[in-house]
């Protein structure tokens, strides 16, 4: 039997081999390449390093480690940059409208560079929230052997014996406005909450998506909960590069890994860890990029059979670094696998199946920790990210429902058409228990860009109204949000969804038990309002925001731009 040699440069040879490619090789020689290098794989390193945000300020050392490992293993590293937006810094401003837009820009960057330069593989490094879905969407579009390296979580800050994180500051603003915290304490929390590089420390969007990537098999085990400053993160970046070289040898591609079954695994883990509502939007987009059939109703199907196992912020007690010490995502996955809630036959980037990767992980969590609960004593029997429907959201919307003392609420609508006026009303004590705040024209097209609502929700929590005031929006929520909040309402206001027709004082019901979001107004009144409603003029007519608003799909389909 003849054994065919492994071709490590199946794509890059299109621009490096043959006499006609002499001009191409001249360009490589200008960068220090030698003749022997043209038989090696050209491996992209999509480096998200940036001094815009602490989430990405610690990525260069990981990129350097990965580059060295690629070259040591016989590859050529080709470095290119990907942009980032700091959700935490842009929160509550017009800048937040660029956050979701950046997901698409990142995916476009990766697809463009990998395809345009005929790369044989790509290693993507990211930190802030949209880096993860944007990176994976680009990897799936290009569909060359690829691995994701998460930049790592931040370590907690400390003040007066309490662990702090970025959400602590948002909530402190509300406490201060309510007279429950001094200016001095607010300033100290501001200064101490974020002690160094890494992504926001709770089970917020970045850590949710990195954990989901580990469950998908597109990142290495244990890598999603490591802290950026720790040496094990460097080691993981180096190991990721070596694993990628093997994936190139075996022609193992992202679409081999990201399947309907592996997405179901990832969502089961998101439910078990109490992850961010943004996972719903992003996995709809990821499935679209992978060519996998996955709908908003699939999240509800997984939720109903998956318990919440981890006591993690924002609604729980612990941070991602605590989860790491308790056994990390592999421990959570092994428990779900043993309970028949994961597909053990899914392939991972290492070439091993999920079951093979987890074979040495204990079936039950250690007794000396409280972060991960045993299967027979979960935090909650069912997942926390519920898909609600009703006349306000016939396409669906997303709510965090676990841990609420009052999972059913009917109250008068308090209507706002921008986040800033809603926040001002909260801080001026104009919102009272029982109100249902409506923030609209903030969807994919209306925002545009579906901005997150952490500033208002953080202020509500800080004022002690987190569970007694409802908030619904066609925008999004930060992974740091908790309380009686419902986001991603679809159809959105700008598309003529019923949320556009709500008037001040209307009765609205949020019912987490019945999975219902309902405007309690007669059909005749709704029809009369619709007859005089007109779509608003676009807020942007040029540039990236105009392109996003014109092309974005509904939130129930992931707010993607290529849904043709």
UniProtKB/Swiss-Prot annotation:
GO MF: 2 iron, 2 sulfur cluster binding; dihydroxy-acid dehydratase activity; magnesium ion binding
EC top class, as a word: lyase
Reactions catalysed, as given in the entry: (2R)-2,3-dihydroxy-3-methylbutanoate = 3-methyl-2-oxobutanoate + H2O; (2R,3R)-2,3-dihydroxy-3-methylpentanoate = (S)-3-methyl-2-oxopentanoate + H2O
Keywords in alphabetical order: 2Fe-2S, Amino-acid biosynthesis, Branched-chain amino acid biosynthesis, Iron, Iron-sulfur, Lyase, Magnesium, Metal-binding
Residues where [2Fe-2S] cluster binds: 55, 128, 200
Enzyme Commission (EC) number: 4.2.1.9
List of catalytic residues: 478
Protein residues bound to Mg(2+): 87, 129-130, 452
Cofactor requirement: [2Fe-2S] cluster; Mg(2+)
Keyword Ligase: no
InterPro entries named in the record: DHAD_IlvD/Edd (IPR050165), Dihydro-acid_dehy_C (IPR042096), DihydroxyA_deHydtase (IPR004404), DiOHA_6PGluconate_deHydtase_CS (IPR020558), ILV_EDD_C (IPR056740), ILV_EDD_N (IPR000581), IlvD/EDD_N (IPR037237)
NCBIfam families in the cross-refs: ilvD, PRK00911.1
Protein name, entry field: Dihydroxy-acid dehydratase
Taxonomy of the source species: Bacteria, Pseudomonadati, Pseudomonadota, Betaproteobacteria, Burkholderiales
Recorded name of the encoding gene: ilvD
């Amino acid at each position: 039997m003849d054994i065919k040699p492994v071709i490590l440069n199946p794509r890059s040879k299109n621009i490096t081999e043959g006499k006609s490619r002499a001009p191409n090789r001249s360009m490589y020689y200008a960068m220090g390449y030698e003749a022997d290098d043209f038989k090696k794989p050209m491996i992209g390193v999509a480096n998200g390093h940036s001094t815009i945000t602490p989430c990405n300020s610690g990525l260069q050392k990981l990129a350097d480690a990965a580059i060295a490992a690629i070259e040591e293993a016989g590859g050529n590293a080709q470095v290119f940059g990907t942009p980032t937006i700091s959700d935490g810094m842009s929160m509550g401003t017009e800048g937040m409208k660029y956050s979701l837009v950046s997901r698409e820009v990142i995916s476009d960057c990766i697809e463009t560079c990998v395809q345009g330069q005929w790369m044989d593989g790509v290693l993507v490094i990211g930190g802030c929230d949209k880096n993860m879905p944007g990176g994976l969407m680009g990897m799936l579009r290009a569909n060359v052997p690829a691995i994701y390296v998460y930049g790592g979580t931040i370590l907690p800050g400390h003040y007066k014996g309490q662990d702090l994180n970025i959400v602590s500051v948002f909530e402190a603003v509300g406490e201060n406005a309510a007279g429950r915290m001094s200016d001095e304490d607010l300033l100290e929390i501001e200064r101490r909450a974020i002690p160094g590089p890494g992504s926001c420390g709770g089970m917020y969007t970045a850590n949710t998506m990195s954990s989901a990537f580990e469950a998908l098999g597109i990142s290495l085990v244990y890598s999603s909960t490591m802290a950026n400053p720790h040496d094990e993160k460097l080691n993981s970046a180096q190991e990721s590069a070596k694993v990628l070289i093997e994936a190139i040898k075996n022609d193992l591609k992202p679409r081999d890994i990201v399947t309907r079954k592996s997405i179901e695994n990832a969502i089961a883990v998101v439910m078990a860890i109490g992850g961010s509502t943004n996972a719903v939007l992003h996995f709809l987009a990821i499935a679209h990029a992978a060519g996998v059939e996955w709908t908003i109703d699939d999240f509800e199907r997984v939720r109903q059979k998956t318990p919440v196992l981890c006591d993690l912020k924002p609604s729980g007690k612990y941070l991602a670094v605590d989860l790491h010490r308790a056994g990390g995502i592999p421990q959570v996955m092994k428990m779900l696998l043993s309970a028949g809630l994961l597909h053990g036959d899914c392939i991972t980037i290492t070439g091993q199946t999920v079951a093979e990767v987890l074979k040495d992980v204990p079936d039950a969590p250690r007794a000396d920790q409280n972060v991960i609960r045993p299967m027979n004593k979960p935090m909650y029997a069912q997942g926390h990210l519920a898909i609600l429907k009703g006349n306000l959201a016939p396409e669906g919307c997303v709510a965090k429902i676990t841990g609420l003392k009052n999972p059913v609420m009917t109250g008068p609508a308090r209507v706002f058409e921008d986040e800033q006026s809603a926040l001002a009303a909260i801080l001026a004590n104009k919102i009272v228990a029982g109100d249902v705040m409506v923030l609209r024209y903030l969807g994919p097209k209306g925002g545009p860009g579906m901005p997150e609502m952490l500033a208002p929700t953080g202020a509500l929590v800080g004022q002690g109204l987190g569970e007694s005031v409802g908030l619904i929006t066609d925008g999004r929520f930060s992974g740091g949000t908790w309380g009686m909040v419902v986001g991603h309402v679809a159809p959105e206001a700008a598309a003529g969804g019923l949320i556009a027709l709500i008037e001040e004082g209307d009765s609205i019901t949020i019912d987490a038990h019945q999975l219902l979001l309902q405007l309690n107004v007669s059909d005749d009144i709704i029809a009369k309002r619709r007859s005089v409603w007109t779509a608003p003029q676009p807020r942007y007519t040029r540039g990236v925001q105009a392109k996003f608003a014109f092309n974005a799909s509904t939130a129930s389909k992931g707010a993607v731009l290529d849904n043709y």
